[in-house]
Amino acid sequence: MLTLDTLNVMLAVSEEGIIEEIILTLLASPQLAIFFEKFPRLKRAISDDLPRWREALRSRLKDARVPPELTEEVMCYQQSQLLGTTQFIVQLPQILALLHRLHSPYAGQAQQLVDSNATFTPALHTLFLQRWRLSLIVQTTALNHQLLEEEREQLLSEVQERMTLSGQLEPVLAENDHAAGRLWDMSAGQLKRGDYQLIVKYGDFLAEQPELKRLAEQLGRSREAKSVPRKDAPMETFRTLVREPATVPEQVDGIQQSDDILRLLPPELATLGITELEYEFYRRLVEKQLLTYRLHGEAWREKVTERPVVHQDFDEQPRGPFIVCVDTSGSMGGFNEQCAKAFCLALMRVALADNRRCFIMLFSTEVVRYELSGPEGIEQAIRFLSQRFRGGTDIASCFRAIIERMQGREWFDADAVVISDFIAQRLPDDVVNKVGELQRVHQHRFHAVAMSAHGKPGIMRIFDHIWRFDTGMRSRLLRRWRR
């Protein structure tokens, strides 16, 4: 069957002009005009999408099939062009019968030409074919318009859905024109209103926690500059942490007798609830004879030294992708969970604005991965925000997953961000050593976002920087009061 693209070529119908007319009609629609006025950043993103629209319209015309009636008429016209005037006069009754049978718009005009001229001359033959061709061009142009109008309606419906989605998410995720462009590209997926409203919800939560948003922006845009000390530079106070052995809550090492109420074994605590044994419990408490967990580890104290002030700064290090690990243990539920998810959303905003990748890993008893900056970033973000934090804590697996990811060539300059309350077992030595190697040799930076003031020093000391956001009730009230 004849395709519309072939018919356009045969009749020299310019499809480009028709396509441009449809594009201009689409851009002039009231829906787009209002949207561009409300979200000017997204106007450029939609303008960059125009080549894709043109290609979609061309593809529609290229693949479209010409109706059988029009195909038969075109084939008859082509055959008639090859006939001389004498042969054409012989075939003329069959041609007129065909035009009437196909209900061709040219049938009446053709019959009138024949009836009004007793003699069919070569000039009349040429005029007959010229008007027939003109009729075919009109029919072909109308068919082009019909198909492109259907495509325009479908395209407008798609654009309206994407505009609704992008308009809702633009205040949350689009910081600049580049971010708006990437957000528009991501909006091509099939999403329902109830899905992306989850992103809006956490965006509103982030707006209510300006300190958390500010912290995410500081972390996301922190860069270390290369520097050298200047001669005769003044001295400044430099504080370092020095490790020394101590009995601190680091690792369970056994059982001992003491009066440490916080480390009581459950059986000892149970005796306190038995009336007959209550006095016995107090006696053993005074004599420090209660069975408690024995904890050993390493403590750190601050050492103050003097060193020359660093003055000269050179080029800043390039900013690479984010690899964000989020603790989904039970202790991270509730307000901690909201803060962790909102923090990741803020990092996604930074990544979109700075053209960086943002890779999320959830760790509890297993590792789940999401990439928030890819073509399906919005869908991935919705899946991440839908997760519930109810697992255990396996921070060692988290670090091993980060180390494995950083071995890839595309992650050679990545920054690792671990969001947790850091109430967990100490890290194995092989993990600590590998992290140190990545920091020294490959200049990877490891950031900790501590959601609790009780994180274990043995875990947190391996990070290059610790960003603290205490989610305790006292800190939350203080932050609200300061606002």
Swiss-Prot record:
Q: Which UniProt keywords apply?
A: Chaperone, Cytoplasm
Concerning SUPFAM superfamilies, the annotation shows:
vWA-like
**Cellular component terms, GO, for this chain's entry?**
cytosol
Kindly list the places in or outside the cell where this protein is found, as annotated in its UniProt entry.
Answer: Cytoplasm
Question: Pfam families this protein is in?
Answer: VWA_CoxE (PF05762)
List the NCBIfam families hit by this protein, alphabetically.
PRK10997.1
Name the family the entry cites.
Answer: Belongs to the ViaA family.
Name of the protein described by the UniProt record: Regulatory protein ViaA
What gene is this protein translated from? viaA
